[in-house]
Curated annotation (Swiss-Prot):
ATP binds at residues 39-46. Residues 430-596 form the Helicase C-terminal domain. This is UvrABC system protein B. The gene is uvrB. Belongs to the UvrB family. Residues 622-657 form the UVR domain. Gene3D superfamilies: 6.10.140.240, P-loop containing nucleotide triphosphate hydrolases, UVR domain. The UvrABC repair system catalyzes the recognition and processing of DNA lesions. A damage recognition complex composed of 2 UvrA and 2 UvrB subunits scans DNA for abnormalities. Upon binding of the UvrA(2)B(2) complex to a putative damaged site, the DNA wraps around one UvrB monomer. DNA wrap is dependent on ATP binding by UvrB and probably causes local melting of the DNA helix, facilitating insertion of UvrB beta-hairpin between the DNA strands. Then UvrB probes one DNA strand for the presence of a lesion.
Length: 658
C-alpha cells in the first residue's frame, strides 16, 4: 500500500491560509508549471506549503538559500510530517577549500575538505528514500544543483537480499566492494562490512546506529536481521533488504574500463596540445596527476577527486547536462523555492563562478578539460529539469513575477499583528527628532532598530547617542558571530535599547521587543533602499503591536512609494480581517531563548563567552574547544543544525584567536 502524506498538527489553516492552499493546489492539479506565494513575515508560509504537499501527494524538493535556513525548514517539516520521509540534503562539507590555482603567484591550493559524516548519512538517506517510497520531502540547499552520480547506476547497483535466496557468501562480499563498501572487522562504521564465519554484517551508508546482519546456511541466506551496531541487540527480523551504494559516484566494472580508456585518450590529446604550444611544465603536471588517478581507479575503483571524471564515468558527451539530485526524483514532483528572491539569483550565479575557477585549473595543467563538465546546472538546465515550482517569498523577485503574473497572497498573521504604519519626516533635524522617539520607546520598555547607509554614519550616530546617555550598540559586517549573539541577546534582555546597523535584513533580527524601525537616508536609491529591501526592513517592526516605521527623507523615491503603498495595502487587509473576526493584535511573547535558539547559538554558550579567547590559557582554550566540538556533534546528531552551525562558527573563531 502506498504511504500518504499526513500532517500531524494541533492547528488548522487560519486567516488567508485556506484560500492560499486552495489556489496553489488548484494550480498544481490543473498543470500550472509556476506559481508565486507572496507570504508576509510571520504568516505561517511553511504550514501553508505543508498543507499543499498533503493535498497534492507529490514527492517534494524544498530549496533554501543556506544551510541554516534549510535546517530550520527541515525541523519544521519533520514536526508536521512525523510519519513520512522528510530528508535533508545539503553540502556535506563542514569546511571546504576547493582546489584552485593563482597564476600571478604560481600558487596551487589543494582541495581541502572536512566531511560531516552525519550530513553524508542524511544525503544517502535522502537518495535511497526516493527509490523506496513516494511520500518523500527533501529539504536541500541550492548546492543540490551540483553534479551527482547517475541515478540509473545508483539504482542498478543496489544489492538486493531476501531470506531463502541462493547466494554465495564470497559473491556478496565482492558485490559490496563493487558498491564502495570496505571490509573492516575492527572499526565497524557507516559504509563498511565485517565477516564472522557464516555471518556478514553490513553498515548501510544511510544509517547511523543500525546495521544489517545476514546469516548464511551454505549458499543460502537463512536469516536477515536489523541490529544495533553498538550493542548487537536485535531490533527486527527482515524478509528483504536493499543495500544502496556507499557513494553517489559508483560505476560498473565494464563502464569503469571504458571510462579509463576515454580518460587516457583525452590525456593523450591534451598532452599533444600542451606540448605543441610549448607548455612543457603543464604537460608534465597533467600527466603525473592523471596517471596517478587512473592507477587508483584501476586498483580501487575510486580516487580522490573522482567527481572531476564524472563525465567519463557516466559516458556522457562533452558539454552534456550533469546528473543532479533532481534526476533522482520521479518525473511528477514538486519544487518549493523558499525565499525565492535570494535563491533564484543564487541558482543563476553558481555555474559562472564554478567555471571561472575550473578554467584556470585546466589552463595550467591541474585538470583535464573534461573536469569542466563536473559542474552545477546552468539556469536554463535547471528550468528544464523542474516539473512544477512554487516560489515563496515576502518580496518575490522580477523573475518569479514574470513567470507567474498571478500572485497568491498570504497577508494575515494568525496572531492578528499588523504591518506597521509608516511616517516620512525631513532629514533636517532628524537626529533630534529620532532622539525624542527613542526616549518614548525606552519609557515603555521597548527597543529600537536604526538602519543607516554608511559605516561612518553608523559609528557617528552610535557615539552621539552614547554621549546623550542612550544605551546603544552597533552591528556591522566585521562583528564576529560570537559578538553578534551577545548583541542580539542583550538587546532583547534590555541591556541596551537601541541597535544601529547598515544591513539589518539578516536572519535573527525578528525581535518582538522592537517597536520602532528608523530608516535614515531612505531617499538614497540603491541596494539597501530598493523596494524589496525597504519592505523587508519594514517587516522588522511587524512583531510588536505598537510597531512603527519612520523614514527620514527629503523626497519620496519610486522604491519608497512602492514599499509604502504595499505596506498600507497589507495593513488594510489585516485590519479588515481582525475587525470581522474580533481579533485584537498582541505582541508575540517569546522567551529570549526561543528566538535565539533558532537563529543564533543558545543561552548555554554563555559559558564559552565568559572569558575572551585571548585571555584564556592554552589549557583552558583546549578544554573549551573539546567541549564545544562534542556539543556540536551532539547537536548535529539531534538534527539541530542551526545550533551545530553556530557552534562550528564559534569554534573557528576560537581557534583563529588562539
Amino acid at each position: 500500500m502506498e504511504r500518504q502524506f499526513e500532517i500531524v498538527s494541533a492547528y488548522s489553516p487560519q486567516g488567508d491560509q485556506p484560500v492560499a492552499i486552495e489556489k496553489l493546489v488548484e494550480g498544481i492539479n490543473s498543470g500550472k508549471k509556476k506559481q508565486v506565494l507572496l507570504g508576509a513575515t510571520g504568516t505561517g508560509k511553511t504550514f501553508t506549503i505543508s498543507n499543499v504537499i498533503k493535498e497534492v501527494q507529490k514527492p517534494t524538493l524544498v530549496m533554501a538559500h543556506n544551510k541554516t535556513l534549510a535546517g530550520q525548514l527541515y525541523s519544521e517539516l519533520k514536526d508536521f510530517f512525523p510519519n513520512n520521509a522528510v530528508e535533508y540534503f545539503v553540502s556535506y562539507y563542514d569546511y571546504y577549500q576547493p582546489e584552485a590555482y593563482v597564476p600571478q603567484t604560481d600558487t596551487f591550493i589543494e582541495k581541502d575538505a572536512q566531511i560531516n559524516d552525519e550530513i553524508d548519512k542524511l544525503r544517502h538517506s535522502a537518495t535511497s528514500a526516493l527509490f523506496e517510497r513516494d511520500d518523500v520531502i527533501i529539504v536541500a540547499s541550492v548546492s543540490c544543483i551540483y553534479g551527482l552520480g547517475s541515478p540509473e547506476e545508483y539504482r542498478e547497483l543496489v544489492v538486493s537480499l531476501r531470506v531463502g535466496m541462493e547466494k554465495d557468501r564470497n559473491q556478496l562480499l565482492r558485490e559490496l566492494v563493487d558498491v564502495q563498501y570496505g571490509r573492516n572487522d575492527i572499526d565497524f562504521k557507516r559504509g563498511t562490512f565485517r565477516v564472522r564465519g557464516d555471518v556478514v554484517e553490513i553498515f548501510p551508508a544511510s544509517l547511523d546506529e543500525h546495521c544489517i546482519r545476514i546469516e548464511f546456511f551454505g549458499d543460502e541466506i537463512d536469516r536477515i536481521r536489523e541490529v544495533n551496531a553498538l550493542t548487537g541487540e536485535v531490533l527486527a527480523e527482515r524478509d528483504h533488504v536493499a543495500i544502496f551504494p556507499a557513494s553517489h559516484f559508483v560505476t560498473r566494472e565494464e563502464k569503469m574500463k571504458v571510462a579509463i580508456e576515454n580518460i587516457e585518450k583525452e590525456l593523450e590529446e591534451r598532452l599533444k596540445e600542451l606540448n605543441d604550444n610549448g607548455k612543457l611544465l603543464e604537460a608534465q603536471r597533467i600527466e603525473q596527476r592523471t596517471r596517478y588517478d587512473l592507477e587508483m581507479m584501476r586498483e580501487m575503483g575510486f580516487c580522490s577527486g573522482i567527481e572531476n571524471y564524472s563525465r567519463h564515468l557516466t559516458l556522457r558527451p562533452a558539454g552534456a547536462t550533469p546528473y543532479t539530485l533532481l534526476d533522482y526524483f520521479p518525473k511528477d514532483f514538486l519544487i518549493v523555492m523558499d525565499e525565492s528572491h535570494v535563491s533564484v539569483p543564487q541558482v543563476r550565479a553558481m555555474y559562472n563562478g564554478d567555471q571561472a575557477r575550473k578554467q584556470v585549473l585546466v589552463d595550467h595543467g591541474f585538470r583535464l578539460p573534461s573536469a569542466l563538465d563536473n559542474r552545477p546546472l546552468t539556469f536554463d538546465e535547471f528550468e528544464e529539469k523542474t516539473n512544477q515550482v512554487i516560489y515563496v517569498s515576502a518580496t518575490p523577485g522580477p523573475y518569479e513575477l514574470e513567470q507567474s503574473p498571478e500572485v497568491i497572497e498570504q497577508i494575515i498573521r494568525p496572531t492578528g499583528l499588523l504591518d506597521p504604519p509608516i511616517d516620512i519626516r525631513p532629514i533636517e533635524g532628524q537626529i533630534d527628532d529620532l532622539l525624542g522617539e527613542i526616549q518614548d520607546r525606552i519609557a515603555k520598555n521597548e527597543r529600537v532598530l536604526i538602519t543607516t547607509l554608511t559605516k561612518k554614519m553608523s559609528e557617528d550616530l552610535t557615539d552621539y547617542l552614547k554621549d546623550v546617555g542612550i544605551k546603544v550598540n552597533y552591528l556591522h559586517s566585521e562583528v564576529k558571530t560570537l559578538e553578534r549573539i551577545e548583541i542580539i541577546r542583550d538587546l532583547r534582555l534590555g541591556k541596551f535599547d537601541v541597535l544601529v546597523g547598515i544591513n539589518l535584513l539578516r536572519e535573527g533580527l525578528d525581535i518582538p521587543e522592537v517597536s520602532l524601525v528608523a530608516i535614515l537616508d531612505a531617499d538614497k536609491e540603491g541596494f539597501l533602499r530598493s523596494e524589496r529591501s525597504l519592505i523587508q526592513t519594514i517587516g522588522r517592526a511587524a512583531r510588536n503591536e505598537n510597531g512603527r516605521v519612520i523614514m527620514y527623507a527629503d523626497r519620496i523615491t519610486r522604491s519608497m512609494e512602492i514599499a509604502i503603498e504595499e505596506t498600507k495595502r497589507r495593513r488594510s487587509i489585516q485590519e479588515a480581517y481582525n475587525e470581522e473576526h474580533g481579533i485584537t493584535p498582541k505582541t508575540i511573547q517569546k522567551g529570549v531563548r526561543d528566538v535565539i535558539r533558532a537563529t543564533t547559538a543558545a543561552e548555554e554558550t554563555e559559558t564559552y563567552e565568559a572569558t575572551p579567547a585571548k585571555k584564556m590559557t592554552k589549557k583552558e582554550r583546549e578544554k573549551t574547544i573539546a567541549k564545544m566540538e562534542a556539543e556540536m556533534k551532539e547537536a548535529a546528531k539531534a538534527l539541530d543544525f542551526e545550533r551545530a552551525a553556530e557552534l562550528r562558527d564559534l569554534l573557528l573563531e576560537l581557534k583563529a584567536e588562539g
